[in-house]
UniProtKB/Swiss-Prot annotation:
<feature type="region of interest" description="Disordered">
    <location>
        <begin position="262"/>
        <end position="545"/>
    </location>
</feature>
<feature type="compositionally biased region" description="Low complexity">
    <location>
        <begin position="225"/>
        <end position="242"/>
    </location>
</feature>
<dbReference type="Pfam" id="PF15266">
    <property type="entry name" value="DUF4594"/>
</dbReference>
<feature type="compositionally biased region" description="Polar residues">
    <location>
        <begin position="457"/>
        <end position="474"/>
    </location>
</feature>
<dbReference type="InterPro" id="IPR029336">
    <property type="entry name" value="DUF4594"/>
</dbReference>
<feature type="compositionally biased region" description="Basic and acidic residues">
    <location>
        <begin position="342"/>
        <end position="359"/>
    </location>
</feature>
<feature type="region of interest" description="Disordered">
    <location>
        <begin position="175"/>
        <end position="245"/>
    </location>
</feature>
<protein>
    <recommendedName>
        <fullName>Coiled-coil domain-containing protein 9B</fullName>
    </recommendedName>
</protein>
<feature type="compositionally biased region" description="Basic and acidic residues">
    <location>
        <begin position="7"/>
        <end position="18"/>
    </location>
</feature>
<feature type="coiled-coil region">
    <location>
        <begin position="52"/>
        <end position="99"/>
    </location>
</feature>
<keyword id="KW-0175">Coiled coil</keyword>
<feature type="region of interest" description="Disordered">
    <location>
        <begin position="1"/>
        <end position="32"/>
    </location>
</feature>
<keyword id="KW-0597">Phosphoprotein</keyword>
<feature type="compositionally biased region" description="Basic and acidic residues">
    <location>
        <begin position="380"/>
        <end position="393"/>
    </location>
</feature>
<feature type="compositionally biased region" description="Polar residues">
    <location>
        <begin position="361"/>
        <end position="374"/>
    </location>
</feature>
<feature type="modified residue" description="Phosphoserine">
    <location>
        <position position="404"/>
    </location>
</feature>
<feature type="compositionally biased region" description="Polar residues">
    <location>
        <begin position="328"/>
        <end position="341"/>
    </location>
</feature>
Amino acid sequence: MISCAEQRSRSRQGEADRAGSGGSSFPPALAPGSCFEILSAPGISMHLAGPHKAESTMRRHEEKDAELDRRIVALRKKNQALLRRYQEIEEDRRQAEQGGMAVTTPGLLQPDSLTVTISQVPGEKRVVSRNWARAPLSPGVTTTLTDDEDAADAPGTFSMGHRVELAVTMENKAKAKRIVSEKPTTQARSPRAKGTSGGGRSWRAPLQMTSSSDSAGKGVLEPRSPGVVSSPPPQQSLGLSPEASWDYTQWKQEREQIDLARLARHRNPQGDWSRPWDLDKAKSMPQNCHKPRDRDLAMGSRKGPRTHQKPQHPPSSLDGKCRGGQSGRPSMTSTIGSNAQGKERLTGRARRYDMKEDEMLQSQEGSQSSTKTPSAEEEFVQKRNEREPDRQETVPATSPIPASPEGLKGESGTSTASLAPDSPQHSDLAPLDLSVGGASSRKPGKSTCILGPKAGAQQSPVSWPNGSEQQTLGCTDHQPGLEVHSCTESQRKAQTPEPMEDRAGKAGAQENLTPRSRPPRGIGPRARGTSKRSRAGGPGPAGRC
């Protein structure tokens, strides 16, 4: 068995031989087959691998640091470029502001005029400075207004002999340029001492400007006092800008013109209403052309049609101008509100239509109530005829309410039927006499038939309108319970509906042509009821036609 010393010696010799021949670079401790390799090889390998990894991580960290440095440098360059660009933009903006101001002054530079044209920069304040006097000003005399002072003091401060600063806030919807002009008077050297319009007004109040459009499309802003009204009265309301108030004024004028044109179409050339339902409107009351509309609204009156009425004592032209050529509001009709409810609020054609409907309903109800009774009686007569087939006499179903001339003739013919006075127990009626009084030429008159409960002949006078003929009818009806019926044929005609005329006329013609025979005395109450109806001519209760 080979000892470790021998193995070491052999390994050293082999290593020397390999070193001479350019062999492997393994250390003696790592030579294959050595005891050191067998015993301590894992510990040495771990010791050698640690520095290798440390070097690689160091290299990676260095590379990352270098990359970060390069990025930092690039960002610094970009920031510098951005800063330079921002500075250039700011410088260009300042130069543009200075170059955009065109100061136009007269040749002598009078101190009572100043016109400055400012290029618009939306949402920013621009300070315009200009000396009122020709003499140069010392730095100590000049006064400046910062943003804080603008917030605390008035927006504009004017002082003769001092530096003038006007702070203007432009609106986004404004036009490209605004001309700010201020013309103070020569006596307004001390504007704070004298509160007048123009430059002499008190500048303690905020600067108010009104815009007016000219032919060039530029708005001119001129400061004005609250009490002074400019030529176009915009009627500014609280919280509205000058442009908004101007737009509202234009819109209001257009709406008034449209309303006037619309209402003018509803009138004829004579000035009257062309529509029939406008005729019931109240007549126009004379009003002053310059009467303010707000006063009427405050009184709570409702406005009528805003149009020109007929020319009255103060003649007014079609364009709404009063005498003297002064423009004014058109005459208006003032009406008083009504508290009526329901159908009482209807006026004119609507009220007439409603009344017509009520009349039609009433006539229909009357016709229905009048047609119910005749139909019931006709059914009763038909049933009676069916139950008594043995009877030889014929009882025609008569119409109790004749309305046509034919029906009147039939009833008058029936009433002229007379009984023989000498034979009270005669059971048959005499044939109809159509020749008495000219039945065809009779007019509606008053026919009275008196039937009493007593036995014996009763007198029944019949009077005609001309009074030429009178006939006494003798009735031998001994049946008790008969009543008096009197009616006027004109009233019958009035109560009869129009659809009953044809049927009544046919029934009257049948009565004229059919002979009537009276039933014997021994027949029961049916005959009495039939006689009652046939003589009275009316189906209803006693006294009804």
